[in-house]
Amino acid sequence: MSNPILLGIFWHFIGAASAACFYAPFKQVKNWSWETMWSLGGFFSWIILPWCISWWLLPDFWRYYGSFDMATLLPIFLFGAMWGIGNINYGLTMRYLSMSMGIGIAIGVTLIIGTLMTPVLQGKFSVLFGSAGGRMTLLGVLVAVIGVAIVSYAGLLKERVLGIRAEEFNLKKGLILAVMCGIFSAGMSFAMDAAKPMHAAAQAQGINALYVALPSYVVIMGGGAVVNLGFCFMRLATCKGISLKADLAQAKPLLIANALFAILGGVMWYLQFFFYAWGHANIPADYTYISWMLHMSFYVLCGGIVGLLFKEWKSVGQKPVRTLVLGCMVIILAANVVGLGMAA
């Protein structure tokens, strides 16, 4: 396996680790509605950071974005909005299914669709089955799905031991939402593929290959921001139990602490895709669709590791922990299989 491929896998792991940890600062926010907290963190992760980093990277910020027509920008923006819908559905999925079942189905669906639909839509179906490397990467995707399923089953065992149930368990609604979440969340993978002209234009301006995807985040995450912020503002305006005015009426020290934690959560959330761009830049051109599989499977892997480090599995017995470790090992195996496939 070549050094660039190893680096690509490594950076995808770092990005996924940030994704697995980003909600920890949000948990420290007190006496705020989820909508206010999510909006503030999201404002930094979807708008402030993408714009600031692009402003810093691009020699001529406005000329760069002005060089693209609507036929190029609109699909990228809409795929970003599609991914934003997936974010909202993710929370609803957890509401109607258990955490483990919701994550297992949603991540499994988005991993498969986001990984395989890109080469199919590009007309590169032969790449998947027509070469030894393509077949091996497909095997790696299958192994990753199995690993995600095992980790999800470990979560189910944990929930049974701890007596955790979904807030409003509804199998039919939960399954529909989980599948929808998986489909819509794959919008990020599609957006990255649609943004290739933006990546090429950034590289033509002399930007390092590791950073060429970052300017496209202004458009991609702009689409996600419209959906997420619109959803949050609508709820703040219409739901009786929550109020922006009440959230901002807290004592000044608490307001400052809440704001800092929300912003930190937003920064950590953005870092997952910052390093996703680094990983993506090191993946061979014929296998860029594998970036999504690496990110999502490592997200589940890192989530399991974080849970163990924070002793969330301390009192659940040996079987759930052993199952979790097995699932994590299978995901690591999947990453190695995919890496060998790309190097073939």
From Swiss-Prot:
NCBIfam families per record: PRK13499.1-1, PRK13499.1-3
- List where in the cell it is found: Cell inner membrane
Any keyword Cell inner membrane? yes
Q: What species is this protein from?
A: Pectobacterium carotovorum subsp. carotovorum (strain PC1)
Under catalytic activity, the entry for this protein gives: L-rhamnopyranose(in) + H(+)(in) = L-rhamnopyranose(out) + H(+)(out)
Q: Which residues form a coiled coil?
A: none
Q: Which UniProt keywords apply?
A: Cell inner membrane, Cell membrane, Membrane, Sugar transport, Symport, Transmembrane, Transmembrane helix, Transport
Gene that this sequence comes from: rhaT
Protein name listed in UniProt: L-rhamnose-proton symporter
Q: What does this protein do?
A: Uptake of L-rhamnose across the cytoplasmic membrane with the concomitant transport of protons into the cell (symport system).
